[in-house]
Amino acid sequence: MFTTFDKYLLTRLIHTFVVFFVATYGLYMVIDLFTNVDDFLREGRSHGEVATSIGRYYGFRMAEFFEMAGPTLIVLSCIAVLGLLEKHSESHPILAAGIPAFRLLRPLLAGGIVLNLLLIANQELLMPSLAVELQTPRGGESASVQKVEPVYDYSNYLMHIDGAEVIIEERRLVNASFNLPRELAVKSYALVAESAVYMPASEKRPAGWLLQNLTGLFDRQLLTEEGQKRVRSAGNGKDVFIVSDVSFDQLYNRGRNLKLLSSWQLIERIRNPSTGFVPVQSQSLALHSRITRPLLSLFSIAMALPLVMRRESRSLIMNMAVCAAVLGGFYALTQASLALGGTHFLRPDLAAWLPVMVMGSASVWTAGYVQT
């Protein structure tokens, strides 16, 4: 049960986090705006339209910044709260009353859990719903058109899928090109169409792409027996349906899109038979890192207490410096481990969970340094 002092610490933690977030995001916005202000100042725009465009752009970017800087700001807020407790000698009456210093962790961990739940809600609910807006360039109206990143369909014998651009709102691929491999055609054969629309699986047909207005004639005799099962003519001679598990959102900005996907969407991509080994590795790493991020944040809070309230040192500045150095080292370890996982030197699960194991052990080891 929370005491009055617990509520006091929890309120101070939330207040400190809000102040840090507003300050850092405001600094980021000012620097980014002054660096890229020309992108917003288009010809023919009034001052009101420019202000609306700036507000809209940075309003949506707030969710992305919260996802990026949130974990670090949570730990910094806890360190600041502990430092203020020591500076104002607010922890001394608690220790004099025989209450262990680790009792202070209860409100701090509770606040860390609440803030991490907000991070999870932002990652799983808000950012996927703002995916289009978060890809809109500065000064642009909407990121409705994106450049195509060609992919290979591993469920279709490495069929190559390409195009000129994708229209996100219509989920349409413009100037689509589907290069059929030898397993589907007797010779290298490319189906080119004005556009292609992805059709999800239904009771009547599997998932695939409907190619509309083919360029040239479709010769079904060029297809192998397997190709005739996967490439189906629509009957009008201009449209063709190709069975494929490559979804629409796999055709543009795949690397950056991982943070714009919910965890369930990541799991669906990992299970998708059309996804190759390299994308599966990066998607698995992103999924594991989402699971471990709250744990790393809570372990950092647990380590901050004995480092800020060290019994060997009465210098608050020295304690804060040691705490910053130790947690900075573990942050570097985490980033290095994720980088090794991204370059396939470590398995995705090991790359994400190795920092958790190291920090969990270190938090137990540093517990003996706390004041009593």
Q: What annotation goes with each model-predicted range?
A:
Residues M1-S155, I168, V186, D239-T372:
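Transmembrane alpha-helices
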